[in-house]
């Protein structure tokens, strides 16, 4: 994890370490996890099964991602740090560096190269252990937990702002670049499903229409024929 966070500004000095095991029919499945958040905008997660690197992840990665999202959202709601919609997995994992290692008595892989773990029982095992242990860590380290939640909230706001900017650009492209002649008096709403575009001929008609229109949902395009 320290290597993954090299040249990054970490949010918390302590690397969070989680261990657990679950007995299955053929023996015990052991889980080890180390994770730390930084100011980076991407995630970096490495997965291993019986010391073999799984570059394509697999069921241990799926379980980890689900647990992280659930645990951070649960803590944020409990401490009233989350006022709007639940944080997405992408928001929670932004800036995360993690290494998850599984010891399995009889693992299954997607191919002979063992690039991806496909043992289905591992998903639930990892999910349960990580959710419980990470929740305990958050309760015992509230300052670290708050930093992680705040990082995710910032990521969520940034993603929403970027989405609105993309929607606005697309919308203007449709209205302005779709072959409508003349000038456009845009409306306030950014929801295409409720917006209307009126074609108005002539300056005098355009002036009257501007005065009488609902600026929130009605846009005008002034044309000259």
Residue ranges and their predicted role:
Residues 1-222:
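GHKL-family ATPase ATP-binding module
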């Amino acid at each position: 994890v320290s290597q993954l966070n090299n040249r990054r500004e970490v949010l918390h000095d302590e690397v969070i370490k989680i261990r657990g095991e679950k007995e299955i029919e053929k023996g015990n499945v052991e889980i080890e996890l180390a994770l730390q958040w930084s100011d980076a905008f991407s995630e970096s997660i490495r997965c291993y099964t019986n010391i073999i690197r799984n570059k394509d992840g697999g069921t241990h990665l799926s379980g980890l991602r689900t647990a992280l999202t659930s645990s951070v959202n649960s803590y944020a709601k409990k401490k009233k740090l989350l006022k709007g919609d639940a944080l997405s997995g992408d928001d929670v994992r932004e800036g995360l560096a993690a290494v998850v290692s599984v010891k399995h008595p009889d693992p299954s892989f997607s191919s002979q190269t063992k690039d991806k773990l496909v043992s289905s029982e591992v998903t639930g095992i990892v999910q349960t252990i990580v959710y419980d242990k990470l929740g305990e860590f958050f309760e015992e380290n509230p300052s670290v937990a708050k930093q992680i939640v705040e990082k995710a909230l910032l990521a969520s706001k940034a993603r929403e702002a970027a989405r609105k900017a993309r929607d606005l650009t697309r919308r203007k492209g449709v209205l302005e670049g779709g072959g409508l002649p003349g000038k456009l008096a845009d409306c306030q709403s950014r929801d295409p499903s409720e917006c209307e575009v009126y074609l108005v001929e002539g300056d005098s008609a355009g002036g009257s229409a501007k005065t009488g229109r609902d600026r929130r949902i009605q846009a005008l395009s002034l044309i000259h024929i």
